[in-house]
């Protein structure tokens, strides 16, 4: 095989990031997302996958059709959709974060499992309708560290049994919709306090500890036939003292491939994440990951450099050509499983009346889940007097982007004045004591506190801090507290619940109903 043809074969194993928006000028992260011209070139040169972020569901449907025409072979078209299509693409259904389903599971195991499977089915069907074929989900990490800055609400629970039951149910639902699935982040990102987008997390667990805890959901999903496993950028010095999991033969080849007998696709987490790119070049990371047993290389910082380097490794026989053929065959096998993309099921969803009914059904189901996952302490009613304040802490303007969202609309209907605080806005904290609100800014009004709190990549848990617990306690002492509603993180809800009198109205919801 000449080097040019070899490079095209190697390129099949790479996944490039692109925007779901149609225009280059609309890209949210132009330094991370390939331009239209560059994306077309890469696909014509053989790159085998695209991961999308942003845009509307209609735009993405068009984008998927376009990139398939540019490509030299069938593509893996994927997205990090963990909470429904609407999490990444406007106009899609946005479901409760997985941790919210775990709260339902605690009350009723069967109901939690049923809901998880239906979420998987609706998500897979909706994703298929717009042209995707691989969902980078479910998250199989067990969030047994409440200070985890990046997994947090993305996890399906805090213990192996809960996560195993719910991820298996979710994966069954996606598979029913004829979509490919991905268990991540092997061998477990739950017990970390570092965001791998920013640095390399170090986890002290040895192999026997992992097998008794973190690996249980992965084993179950592998036995259930999950199509791919994503390896996390995680350092386990008691298993491999030299390399992070992504580049570790001990973890990828010896544990996942040989011990677990896994013969599906193994994919890296994004190689441009600082956990890898701080220390390894795109060229070295690609070669080392593949040599460790990886099949698919996701989002290297410099994709051309990575493809060239891996091509050289095969051409010089540093890595055998047999390994290349095995990975290409694994990729083909998974694409063959989902069959003809123009099957009857997808064709049915092209009819607008069927499509609209499906979206309405998914939307109603999403809202019904939220209603099932709301916790209210006691039967207290929050009342407002003139000029009382609805203080909403957000970290994302999408949380209050619709004036009809309950967090805004319901308090306003009973007399509260909405006041939104955001990290980019004016600080509400005292200059001398950052743990207390500057009450002088709020007059003599009583305050309803609503907090949107969740761990997020690159941001972490900035608002899951003790200062909110203390600030709310101070409001209670000064008799300025009307009530508290926590959205997202159940850990903050638990702390506040223990710290304030039971007469204070208190509620928790993993999300808000969009109606």
Named regions from a protein language model:
Residues 1-40, 45-46, 258, 282-515:
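Preference for extracellular/luminal or secreted protein segments
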Residues 10-12, 46-48, 72-75, 132-133, ...:
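Short, well-ordered coil/turn segments that N-cap beta-strands
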Residues 19-33, 39-166, 185, 190-204, ...:
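Enzymes and membrane/adaptor proteins characterized by extended Gly/Ser/Thr/Asp/Glu-rich
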Residues 59-69, 122-125, 161-173, 216, ...:
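Alpha-helical scaffolding segments of alpha/beta enzyme cores, especially the outer helices
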Residues 128, 175, 222-223, 290, ...:
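Anion (oxyanion) recognition and catalysis
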Residues 166-183, 187, 196, 208-228:
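Phosphate/pyrophosphate-binding betaalpha-module
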Residues 250-266, 270:
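Catalytic PLP-binding core of fold-type I/II PLP enzymes
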């Amino acid at each position: 095989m000449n080097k040019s043809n070899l490079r095209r074969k190697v390129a099949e194993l790479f996944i490039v990031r692109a925007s779901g928006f149609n225009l280059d000028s609309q890209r949210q992260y132009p330094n991370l997302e390939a331009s239209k011209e560059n994306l077309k070139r890469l696909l014509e040169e053989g790159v085998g996958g695209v991961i999308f972020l942003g845009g509307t569901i209609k735009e993405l449907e068009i984008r998927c059709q376009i990139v398939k025409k540019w490509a030299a072979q069938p593509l893996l078209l994927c997205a990090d959709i963990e909470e429904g299509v609407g999490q990444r693409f406007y106009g899609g259904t946005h479901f409760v974060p997985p941790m919210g389903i775990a709260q339902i599971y605690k009350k009723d195991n069967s109901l939690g499992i049923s809901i998880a499977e239906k979420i998987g089915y609706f998500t897979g069907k909706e994703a298929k309708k717009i042209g995707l074929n691989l969902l980078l989900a479910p998250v199989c990490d067990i969030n047994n560290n409440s200070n985890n800055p990046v997994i947090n609400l993305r996890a399906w629970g805090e213990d192996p049994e809960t996560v195993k039951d719910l991820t298996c149910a979710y994966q069954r639902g996606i598979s029913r919709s004829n979509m490919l699935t991905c268990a991540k982040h092997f061998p477990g990102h739950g017990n970390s306090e570092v965001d791998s987008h920013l640095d390399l997390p170090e986890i002290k667990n040895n192999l026997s500890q992992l097998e008794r805890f973190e690996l249980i959901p992965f084993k179950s999903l592998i036995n259930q036939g999950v199509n791919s496993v994503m390896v996390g950028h995680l350092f386990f010095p008691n298993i491999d003292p030299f390399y992070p999991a992504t580049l570790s033969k001990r973890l990828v080849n010896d544990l996942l491939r040989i011990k677990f007998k896994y013969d599906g696709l193994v994919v890296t987490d994004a190689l441009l994440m600082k956990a890898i790119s701080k220390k390894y070049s795109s060229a070295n990371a690609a070669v080392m990951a593949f040599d460790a047993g990886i099949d698919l290389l996701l989002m290297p910082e410099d994709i051309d450099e990575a493809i060239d380097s891996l091509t050289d490794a095969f051409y010089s026989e540093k890595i055998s050509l047999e390994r290349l053929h095995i990975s290409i065959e694994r990729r083909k096998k998974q694409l063959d499983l989902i069959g003809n993309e123009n099957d009857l099921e997808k064709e049915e969803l092209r009819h607008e009346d069927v499509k609209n009914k499906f979206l309405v059904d998914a939307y109603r189901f999403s809202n019904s889940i939220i209603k099932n996952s709301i916790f209210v302490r006691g039967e207290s009613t929050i009342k407002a007097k003139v000029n009382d304040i609805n203080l909403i802490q957000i970290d994302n303007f999408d949380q209050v982007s619709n004036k009809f969202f309950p967090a805004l609309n319901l308090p306003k209907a009973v007399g509260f004045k909405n006041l939104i605080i955001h990290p980019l806005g004016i600080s509400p904290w005292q200059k001398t004591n950052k743990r207390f609100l500057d009450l002088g800014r709020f007059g003599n009004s009583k305050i309803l506190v609503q907090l949107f709190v969740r761990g997020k990549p690159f941001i972490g848990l900035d608002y899951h801090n003790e200062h909110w617990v203390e600030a709310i306690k101070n409001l209670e002492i000064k008799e300025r507290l009307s009530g508290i509603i926590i959205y997202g993180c159940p850990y903050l809800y638990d702390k506040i619940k223990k710290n304030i009198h039971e007469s204070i109205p208190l509620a928790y919801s993993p999300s808000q109903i969009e109606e």
